């Protein structure tokens, strides 16, 4: 019997119904599946019934087990198994062609990995298991108290959907929190919206400023980095009141403020 390791945040999904619902939520047109965290291979097994799969597993002790379990699939090249930290591999790309990500993510790296998937031009979308609170943040809409920078980033490329909750007793060992499965099917790419990757990175930094102190108004947050008179002029132009908080805006308004600040900056050069 394999004992889950705390250092890897391992909680193995054993609920057959939840596994089936994850498979059903993957778009029919998905061709290449990348899985992060093959674990004991329960989800991997279900994925291989429909798709070609490339799985990343960080736990060396599980690699030999997975090689044995999926020996036939490895031999006929329907399955590719990679040992290592997916976050480190992401620097050079998880896959050399378009793919759809499926993952039961360790809670401690879930947000970071989803943001990587959002930024990855080759990633067409994802179905991911995360802590319920994280799921609510990614899927939050303008006006929700959970709405934040990561909600905006997800909204840029498509609509992040909260699919279903998964209780703690669906896992072995059972985590101390409730989990949830979310899905993002990308409908836009970075160059559909931004001039280049530099502008996109600048926009992400801009969002960090906007949400730096959620209880303060967006005007107060932005005025720590930008001239207040210029901000007031932009807000007036966009017909926005200065007492708005960041969670009350949407991507379109954030982008309009960002673009106007950029135009002002270029004029002053």
UniProtKB/Swiss-Prot annotation:
It is found in: Cytoplasm. It comes from Campylobacter hominis (strain ATCC BAA-381 / DSM 21671 / CCUG 45161 / LMG 19568 / NCTC 13146 / CH001A). Its main location: cytoplasm. SUPFAM superfamilies: S-adenosyl-L-methionine-dependent methyltransferases. SMART domains: rADc (SM00650). S-adenosyl-L-methionine binds at residues 11, 13, 37, 57, 85, 104. This is Ribosomal RNA small subunit methyltransferase A. PROSITE patterns: RRNA_A_DIMETH (PS01131), SAM_RNA_A_N6_MT (PS51689). Specifically dimethylates two adjacent adenosines (A1518 and A1519) in the loop of a conserved hairpin near the 3'-end of 16S rRNA in the 30S particle. May play a critical role in biogenesis of 30S subunits. NCBIfam families: ksgA. Belongs to the class I-like SAM-binding methyltransferase superfamily. rRNA adenine N(6)-methyltransferase family. RsmA subfamily. It comes from the Bacteria. It is an enzyme of class 2 (transferase).
